[in-house]
């Protein structure tokens, strides 16, 4: 069995592809896997590092307005489709799987034209422009958040699979995680705005921590992210007259390296609303306060967060309304009632799909069998 994957640009498009590829390999060890990406995207480093071969094509994303860049991108597409066809004819895949990002556009379009089974996976509640276009050509659209189906009415076939999560996050028991972190009965709140950090998110979170530090009501773990975010956050504490070293119930670090343990031990998570983060939160049934990033394309995170909010698994604070006061109100409302905390966790778990990778693998195999 041969599977060609296309997707990239950001980790949010690459990690689902890797999760699916690794799961297929676990189930069928003789499967040949190949990737297509661009040299400018993160896939250029992540895919080879993960042990998979990759070919590159030249293509860029469309801008949201008419410009020279948009015209240049349009001019690149015929060559990108031709290059994709060449790669496909050489590798001879049984199925081509796209996981989002502009690179999967020409690859899946080329595969569809060559009558090879195709599946595109969309992780966000509001599908990107590439998925919307491809939905008219591919055999199947697998959606990570069920709300997404209403935005792709022209799709031939839509199946809800959820978004793949790291298997390691599913194997940690809550009681063992809390024991490992030496937690007591106080609510344990973890806060992170992403691996690169988020300036305004971090400022508000730091201000909230300062406002509750002396109450010792919570155990708090905050990951600031990189790009000098840690220094900026620590300066924020200093400006507020708070020395976090004096509080054994507050931990501030650049990155939360034991995220599997921390997430499972947490009573409440405060985070952005990227699709991968939400997949993990719901897979383990974790209540959350979501602060969607206003800086992402098509306001994806707002749509993602509102979907979880409607399901009763999270509260949402728009960044424009984010402050120590709004965070405190949301945290207090959730953790003050054990019943509400449990109810939100249950609702979150109802939206989770821990076996997402298996579901997608099943669809991939179904497409291959159907084409035999």
Q: Would you name each region that the model predicts?
A:
Residues 340-354:
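A short, well-ordered alpha-helix in the C-terminal region of glycosyltransferases
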Residues 41, 46, 174-176, 182-269, ...:
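Donor-nucleotide binding loops and adjacent catalytic segments primarily
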Residues 353-372:
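C-terminal alpha-helical cap of glycosyltransferases
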Residues 114, 264-266, 280-292:
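Conserved donor-binding/catalytic loop of nucleotide-activated donor transferases
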Residues 85-96, 104-119, 132-137:
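Glycosyltransferases and closely related glycan-assembly transferases
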Residues 31, 42, 53, 112-175:
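Active-site-proximal region of nucleotide-activated glycan assembly enzymes
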Residues 93-95, 256, 260-277, 286:
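Acidic donor-binding loop of glycosyltransferase active sites
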Residues 3-7, 30-81, 193, 320:
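Conserved nucleotide-sugar phosphate-binding/catalytic loop shared by glycosyltransferases and other
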């Amino acid at each position: 069995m041969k599977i060609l994957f296309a997707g990239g640009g950001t980790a949010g498009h690459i990690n689902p592809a890797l999760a699916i590829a690794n799961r297929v390999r676990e189930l069928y060890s003789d499967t040949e896997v190949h990737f297509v990406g661009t040299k400018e995207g993160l896939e250029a480093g992540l895919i080879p590092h993960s042990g998979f071969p990759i070919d590159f094509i030249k293509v860029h994303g469309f801008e949201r307005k008419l410009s020279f860049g948009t015209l240049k991108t349009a001019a690149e597409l015929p060559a990108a489709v031709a290059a994709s066809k060449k790669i496909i004819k050489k590798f001879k895949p049984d199925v081509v799987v796209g996981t989002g990002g502009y690179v999967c556009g020409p690859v899946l379009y080329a595969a569809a034209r060559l009558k090879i089974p195709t599946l595109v996976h969309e992780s966000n509640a509001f599908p990107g422009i590439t998925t919307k276009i491809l939905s008219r050509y591919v055999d199947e659209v697998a959606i990570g958040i069920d709300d997404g189906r209403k935005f792709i009415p022209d799709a031939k076939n839509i199946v809800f699979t959820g978004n793949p999560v790291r298997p390691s996050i599913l194997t940690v028991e809550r009681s063992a995680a809390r024991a490992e972190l030496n937690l007591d009965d106080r609510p344990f709140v973890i806060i992170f705005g992403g691996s690169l950090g988020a300036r305004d998110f971090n400022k508000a979170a730091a201000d909230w921590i300062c406002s509750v530090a002396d109450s010792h009501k919570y155990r708090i773990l905050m990951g600031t992210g990189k790009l000098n975010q840690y220094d900026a956050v620590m300066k924020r504490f200093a400006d507020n007259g708070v020395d976090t070293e004096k509080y054994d119930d507050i931990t501030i670090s650049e990155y939360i390296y034991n995220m599997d343990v921390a997430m499972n031990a947490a009573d409440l998570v405060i985070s952005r609303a990227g699709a991968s983060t939400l997949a993990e939160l719901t897979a383990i049934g974790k209540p959350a306060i979501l602060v969607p990033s206003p800086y992402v394309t098509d306001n994806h995170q707002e749509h993602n967060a509102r979907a979880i909010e409607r399901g009763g698994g999270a509260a949402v604070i728009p960044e424009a309304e984010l402050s120590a006061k709004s965070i405190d109100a949301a945290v207090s409302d959730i953790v003050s009632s054990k019943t509400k905390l449990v109810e939100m966790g249950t609702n979150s778990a109802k939206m989770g799909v821990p076996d997402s990778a298996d579901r997608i693998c099943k669809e991939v195999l179904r497409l291959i069998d159907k084409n035999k």
